Design a protein with these regions (language model features):
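Short polybasic amphipathic segments
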Residues: 78, 93-104
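C-terminal "lid/loop" region of Rossmann-like NAD(P)-dependent oxidoreductases
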Residues: 66, 107-117
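Short linear motifs in exposed loops
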Residues: 59, 90-91, 109, 142, ...
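Active-site loop of classical SDR/Rossmann-like NAD(P)-dependent oxidoreductases
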Residues: 114-126
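Conserved anion/nucleotide-ligand pocket segment
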Residues: 1-11
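Contiguous beta-strand/loop segments that form the cofactor/metal-binding neighborhood of enzyme cores
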Residues: 8, 14-93, 123-135
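Short beta-strand segments
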Residues: 56-58, 106, 139, 166
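C-terminal helix-rich "cap/oligomerization" subdomain common to oxidoreductases
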Residues: 39, 51, 128-171
Length: 171
């Protein structure tokens, strides 16, 4: 597979970053292949730069592990830091919050089933779409939204190839 880390894993973070922070203005990326037995990149990072000064960074490496008993929880870990607090999502599904000035993290409980791939995210996505088709429930995602994710994925690969920061043109 020519495109690996960003195509298989990073695209989900593109989606999450867009959901949480909106559309990036520019991006930069540095990708590399560490394992010579595969065709695509397996390590690297990309940064989304936002008009308001916010930065969102993905730093991934398919050769490293993270804290999870279930190795099918392959999405890694995430840390969000801001002026109103910090959120941490760990590889085992633990979600924590810390307010500014506090030293202790508070656990956020939420419904999470540690079964099948990625906490059963594929099943839940398929159920969501079937519910929309059968019951006319609203979709939380659209083809147009996902196509924008794929456009940003392509820009990430272009940025890594050209070693340049690229504009994320918005229609």
């Amino acid at each position: 597979m020519k495109n690996f880390l960003i195509h298989e894993t990073g695209v989900h973070f593109i989606d999450v970053f867009r959901y949480l922070f909106g559309e990036p203005q520019t991006l930069s990326a540095d990708l590399r292949r560490l394992n010579p037995a595969i065709a695509g990149e397996d390590a690297g990072h990309f940064i989304f730069y936002y008009e308001n000064g916010l930065r969102a960074q993905f730093d991934g490496n398919r050769l490293l592990d993270h804290a999870a008993k279930n190795t099918r929880l392959t999405m890694g870990e995430m840390l969000i830091e801001g002026t109103k607090g910090s959120l941490a999502l760990y590889g085992n599904g633990d979600l924590l919050h810390r307010l500014p000035g506090n030293t202790e993290w508070q656990t956020i409980t939420y419904p999470f089933d540690d079964n099948d791939f990625g906490g059963d995210c594929v099943f839940l996505m398929q159920k969501h779409i079937v519910d929309h088709l059968k019951k006319n429930t609203p979709l939380q995602n659209t083809v147009a939204d996902y196509l924008k994710n794929l456009q940003l994925e392509e820009l990430i690969y272009e940025s890594a190839k050209t070693h340049t920061r690229l504009d994320c043109a918005h229609e």
